[in-house]
């Protein structure tokens, strides 16, 4: 297993690996495999690229192969959203409280805080930039910045209808 993502939550360190999710309890010096399943019996078994806790307390998990998972620690419920993409690369929450997910195929995806899909912002094939994958996300002052392909930068202005691409 290689570690690809980390998130701190109280005394716990959530660890995204090449084969699932683990939690390290620092107070007990103990590792646990995150074995929660969805109501359909699905558990996180593939590469975890990003783990983010949103303002409402839900934990969003981006995977390469199983899409997005959302864990509610209060209700102890895990849900999976793979309808829009199986290959989620990164997650960030904007200043508008919406959750943005980068996809290897579908561009920038936008969800409300509960996980309801709102809209996608695809990378235009007309730009002829080759690789259409959105690699990483970062929220800065009402803008969602992203790495696109191998030589491009994208910017989505919260509330707008398009993802602008800048060639580097």
Predicted features, each with a name:
Residues 1-168:
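Carboxylate-rich, polar loop motifs that coordinate divalent cations or form catalytic acidic clusters
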């Amino acid at each position: 297993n290689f570690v690809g993502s980390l998130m701190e939550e109280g005394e716990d360190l959530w660890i995204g690996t090449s084969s699932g999710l683990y939690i390290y309890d620092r107070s007990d010096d103990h590792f646990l495999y995150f074995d929660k399943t969805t109501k359909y019996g699905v558990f996180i078994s593939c590469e975890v690229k990003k783990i983010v806790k949103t303002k409402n307390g839900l934990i969003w998990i981006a995977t390469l192969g199983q899409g997005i998972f959302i864990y509610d620690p209060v209700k102890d419920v895990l849900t999976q959203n793979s309808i829009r993409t199986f290959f989620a690369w990164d997650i960030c929450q904007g200043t508008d409280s919406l959750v943005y997910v980068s996809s290897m195929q579908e561009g920038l995806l936008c969800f409300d805080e509960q996980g309801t899909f709102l809209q996608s912002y695809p990378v235009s094939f007309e730009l002829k930039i080759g690789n259409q994958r959105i690699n990483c996300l970062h929220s800065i002052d009402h803008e969602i910045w992203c790495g696109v392909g191998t030589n491009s930068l994208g910017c989505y202005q919260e509330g707008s209808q398009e993802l602008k691409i800048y060639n580097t």
